[in-house]
Amino acid sequence: MNRILVIGDLLTDRYRFLKPLRSDPANNVALVVESEREEMVDGGAGNLVRNLKSLCGEDVHFWCGTGKEKPTKIRYYVEDRFILREDREDVIKHDENVIDEFVDLIEDEDFVVISDYHKGTIEGADIVRIISRCDELENVTVFADTNHVFPEHQGVGWLKINLETARECVNKNDKNLARIISEKNNSNVIITKGEDGFIAYLKELGQLIVFTKDKNKGFVDAIGAGDTFLAGFVSYLARHNTGELPALVYADIVAHLSTSQLGTIDVVTAEAADKEYKNLKTSEKEEEDTLYVHRTIDNV
């Protein structure tokens, strides 16, 4: 299996579960609550790494900022209903030593993942440097997950973005978004669309994949779903080293499983994802250079 090297913004995800007691006598709208429990896990690129390790083992290596204070997202729940999110320390100090160490350790055959939450760990020049180093080596595959597409992403092997980012990059709203961004960026492109599936363009095959699926009646929330999609995709390629379409479908399965549980508290296991993949039901239709894939979901 390929080594997986990840660099990105390590965040902290905290979840506070509150029990309502009564209304505040000074303001009937406000609740008086008591804390029932709290969960804290690695978020951002840390969530990606946790799921990668769960899906494909321990040969996953992570570089992140070195500051004591990490950006923290605190989500508050009352009777399991998500009420609000509080963000703290939203910036990570850039450390050139982290970039130096990461670049120096990349080897032939590695999978290199750039998970950029735009908090400060990675700067544009770092992305160029990482991609350039990988181009000098043999069979290194580079994946970039970003909320903004910049010129520095030019030539990355796989660019994964969401639909909002794609529309920001190209002012269009149709299935050809992935193709246009691919031609502009010289990359394979994946555009995730949440519960509506994804669009992907495989540049060497010149093939557009439009993936749709049934509604997930067990949907809880989409927190961290982008990370789990990428974890599923990278882990499948690392384990099987072939098959972009199966890897994309597997990625959607992993994201689907993550949206059926609350937040980023629990990872998706290889056992659960492999079982779901084994029982997969899809239909395909090909029209010119576009492959339409629909997944049927058993919502029991």
Question: Which residues make up each language-model segment?
Answer:
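Short, well-ordered alpha-helix to beta-strand connector turns
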Residues: 2, 108-109, 155-157, 185-187
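Conserved N-terminal subdomain of the carbohydrate kinase-like
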Residues: 2-4, 11-114, 125-128, 272-300
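Structural beta-sheet core signal
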Residues: 5-6, 62, 144, 191
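Residues immediately flanking
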Residues: 9-10, 163, 193
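Active-site metal-binding loops of divalent metal-dependent hydrolases
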Residues: 9-10, 117, 228
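Conserved beta-alpha-beta core of the PfkB/ribokinase-like small-molecule kinase fold
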Residues: 18-27, 72, 76, 80-92, ...
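Short hydrophobic/aromatic-enriched beta-strand-loop microsegments
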Residues: 60-62, 158-163, 208-212
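Conserved phosphate-binding/catalytic region of the ribokinase-like
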Residues: 125-155, 168-300
